[in-house]
Regions:
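Aromatic- and glycine-rich peptidoglycan recognition patches
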Residues: 164-167, 171, 194-196, 235, ...
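Second-shell loop/turn segments in exported
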Residues: 63-67, 238-242, 262-270
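Active-site nucleophilic cysteine motif
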Residues: 255, 267-286
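SH3/SH3-like beta-barrel superfamily modules
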Residues: 61-63, 67, 74, 126-158, ...
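...with weaker cross-activation on analogous glycine-rich loops/strands in unrelated enzymes
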Residues: 290-354, 360
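N-terminal targeting leaders
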Residues: 8-11, 21-128, 133, 159-165
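Beta-loop motif signature
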Residues: 108-131, 180-209, 263
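Boundary regions of SH3-family modules and the immediately adjacent low-complexity/disordered segments
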Residues: 75-99, 149-182, 192-197, 217-254, ...
Length: 397
């Protein structure tokens, strides 16, 4: 009798444990599903948002681990779990990291900082940021810093590319008077006789204005170095902003100043550009910050054409090229150029050059016409993906 009772008790324990494990497994699946949904909502593009969250299932229950730069996403996840009655310890690291000790801002300190996909020099060149660009610093790994640029792009930079700043320092930098370099490429010198170079400079570089005379600006770099730039090559930032002529013709004029500049994967400076880095640079030099990559730019502005009816296009429109969607594969945008009229577009392919969609033209681009996808209009469009520097100044402020 005693053996029978013990057997029944053992069976009951097994059933209880089984049920408990079943409930736990069910909760873990729900938890994983909710994490995925939150990620899709707040961080659908890993190039611009970080949300790497995992679940540990230990003796004391569920534990959320990982990192993100999206506090609102974590708040949303905790609210959903509470609503569903799932208890989980939150050990997610919300960036910026504590070990930065308040140095969570930085300013690009060289003409064009190379930003990598991973924290090493051999990693892919993800993008570039030009001198004077204010960035957010999220964490440090070895000697490298994970930063986020004004267009929200996430990438790694070595310490030589930035000047770290705390809140007080970045506030002082932002509030100081600035100049913007408007020539395609040049140099800053230690004196007005232009003998000793301090640094090279690319178009769109922004520096602190220290003083000026009839012919030169005296400027300061983010790290405090001082130099001189000819007034023929730069403008006071506020003067430049107020003088911007954000029109199709100004976009075309700017685009042609980069003719022959070499193609560089990840390039967004006048030293070298990839296709989307080129269109991004053209728009920035006319006062507009647009998304970084072609596959992001294609979602900005308003649709114009998707059937190769080039008569609908206006100067300044962006044309996108790539692989069309099929029953088994998604569309893939891989290239972008800007329409300049007369059946022509300008783009960075091997170098910055002009191509035509006209079969009779000597510069007819059969390859790109054959993979044409659609055209978007960004000029004068109201879109949260487009930042107008005359209204919202993410570079300076």
């Amino acid at each position: 009798m005693k053996r029978i009772l013990l057997t029944k008790a053992f069976v009951l324990i097994l059933i209880t444990l089984n049920n408990s494990c079943g409930v736990r497994m069910g909760q873990k699946k729900v938890l994983a599903s909710e994490i995925e949904q939150i990620k899709n909502t707040f961080a659908p593009d890993k190039r611009t948002a970080l949300f790497n969250i995992d679940v540990l299932d230990g003796p004391s229950g569920f534990t959320l681990i990982g990192e993100t730069n999206l506090p609102r996403a974590i708040d949303s996840l905790e609210a959903v779990l509470s609503e569903k009655g799932i208890v989980a310890t939150n050990e997610v690291n919300v960036l910026p990291a504590d070990n930065l000790e308040g140095m969570t801002k930085a300013v690009i300190n060289i003409s064009a900082a190379n930003l990598r996909s991973n924290p090493k020099h051999s990693a892919e060149l993800a993008t570039q940021a030009t001198l004077g660009t204010v960035v957010n610093v999220l964490k440090k790994e070895g000697d490298w810093y994970l930063i986020q640029t004004p267009d929200k792009y996430l990438a790694w930079v070595d310490p030589g590319g930035i000047q770290l700043m705390n809140n007080a320092e970045i506030t002082a930098w932002k509030s100081s008077e600035k100049i913007i370099y408007t020539n395609t490429y040049g140099h800053a010198f230690s004196s007005i006789d232009a003998v000793n170079r301090i640094s090279d400079i690319v178009a769109g570089s922004i520096l602190k204005l220290v003083g000026s005379d009839e012919s030169h600006f005296k400027i300061a770099f983010p790290d405090g170095r001082q130099a001189y730039i000819s007034k023929d090559e730069a403008q006071e930032y506020e003067t430049w902003l107020s003088s911007l002529d954000y029109t199709a013709n100004s976009l075309i004029e700017t685009s042609k100043t980069l003719m022959g500049v070499p193609y560089l994967w990840g390039g967004t400076s006048t030293k070298g550009v990839d296709c989307s880095g080129y269109t991004k640079t053209i728009y920035f030099l006319n006062g507009m910050v647009i998304p970084r990559d072609a596959s992001q730019q294609v979602h900005a502005g308003k649709p114009v054409d998707s059937i190769a009816d080039f008569s609908k296009l206006e100067k300044g429109d962006l044309l996108f090229f790539g692989r069309k969607a099929t029953d088994s594969t998604a569309e893939k945008v891989v290239h972008v150029g800007m329409w300049i009229g007369d059946k022509q577009f300008i783009h960075s392919s091997e170098m910055v050059r002009i191509s035509s969609v006209d079969e009779e033209s000597p510069n007819y681009d059969a390859f790109n016409v054959g993979r044409y996808l659609r055209t978007q209009r960004l000029l004068n469009e109201d879109d949260p993906l487009l930042q107008n520097l005359t209204i919202n100044q993410p570079i300076k402020d």
